[in-house]
UniProtKB/Swiss-Prot annotation:
This is tRNA N6-adenosine threonylcarbamoyltransferase. Belongs to the KAE1 / TsaD family. It comes from Deinococcus geothermalis (strain DSM 11300 / CIP 105573 / AG-3a). Binds 1 Fe(2+) ion per subunit. The gene is tsaD. GO terms for molecular function: iron ion binding; N(6)-L-threonylcarbamoyladenine synthase activity. Its EC number is 2.3.1.234.
Length: 333
């Protein structure tokens, strides 16, 4: 089978303008050739992402980031054989920028266009890095998502558990903000936690005794707020919160791995960069696979990888009428 060689991927689902290029070899193997991300620092002053502002920033940056990605790959736009872009889930206005840009580029080049699911992109960011074959569990944990999937076969996704309230990354952001540690909260919490004492601010494990594999972070947020009001040191608060969140994520995932008989867990999304989370999984009985450098947070290379997977699986290109969707369950394809 002859595959399109160079695939461009675009992700504008939130506040990062990501464009990447992968090379799909005749044997089906795939290699990331470029991955460029423009992170919108303007949102830091607001303590969170402003959707309309994010959309405007994408419009201003996407052409430049695309050019940078092509230059990094040593290619011209005419070398592209397919284009993939995130269609959801995410901020609709932001998604539309990348989606319309990708469609227009594919149409101008007369090459196939593939609408990609943001969560599938995160999964492939780790799975492709290790040339991993199903079956495995996939934990996608980021600022907007906390989902646990069983992946019995490539392209088949069974939702095992999900957050009942906040996503893990969102909880990190909110706790960091109330403790005055800055934004984004993930790196801020991780850095402060190194200087803190987790025993100084104890947190109870959420959803104790549950038979399923769901997540919840509202209780940890409330406990952090109460500790802050009681005068807890920011670094101790960060240490206690991080330890509780990591134990909860890892413990729930390990229970699911035992229940589904999986020995390998893919861990992806922005929170996957957390040092404590990686160390906890490394010490666990499962094989934990994480994305490579630059592929944890939102990026275009992971969408190009999802496009490559669609091509290898023989999926038909997406219609140019494909729209952006804010909420899109990851269905088996």
């Amino acid at each position: 089978m002859t595959f399109p060689r160079y695939i461009l991927g675009i992700d504008t689902s939130c506040d990062d303008t990501g464009v990447g290029v992968v090379e799909l070899a005749p044997d089906g193997s795939v290699q990331v050739r470029a991955n460029r991300v423009w992170s919108q620092t303007v949102h830091a002053q607001y303590g969170g992402v402003l959707p309309e502002l994010a959309s405007r920033e994408h419009v201003e940056r996407i052409d430049t980031v695309t050019g940078d990605a092509l230059a990094e790959a040593g290619l011209t736009v005419g070398d592209l054989a397919a284009v993939a872009a995130t269609s959801g889930p995410g901020l609709v206005g932001a998604l539309l920028v990348g989606l319309m840009y990708g469609k227009g580029l594919a149409q101008a080049l007369n090459v196939p266009f593939y609408a990609a699911h943001h969560l599938e992109g995160h999964i492939f960011a780790a799975a492709s890095e290790a040339d991993l074959q199903a079956p495995y569990l996939a934990l996608v944990v980021s600022g907007g998502h906390t989902h646990l999937f069983d992946v019995p076969r490539e392209g088949e996704y069974v939702l095992v558990g999900a957050t009942r309230d906040d996503a893990a990354g969102e909880a990190f952001d909110k706790v960091a903000r109330l403790a005055g540690l800055g934004y984004p909260g993930g790196p801020a919490i991780s850095e402060a936690a190194r200087r803190g004492d987790p025993e100084a601010v104890p947190f109870k494990e959420p959803l104790q005794g549950q038979k399923g594999f769901d997540f919840s972070f509202s209780g940890l947020k409330t406990a952090a707020l109460l500790a802050h009001r009681a005068g807890a040191k920011p670094e101790d608060l960060a240490a206690g919160f991080e330890r509780a969140a990591v134990r909860f994520l890892v413990g729930t995932t390990l229970r699911a791995a035992r229940a589904y008989g999986r020995e390998t867990v893919v861990v992806s999304g922005g929170v996957a960069a957390n040092r404590a989370l990686r160390e906890a999984f490394a010490a666990s009985p499962v094989r934990a696979v994480f994305p490579g450098k630059g592929l944890n947070t939102d990026n275009g290379a992971m969408i190009a990888l999802a496009g490559a997977a669609a091509i290898r699986a023989g999926r038909a290109p997406s219609p140019l009428s494909e729209g952006a969707v804010a909420y899109a369950p990851l269905a088996s394809v």
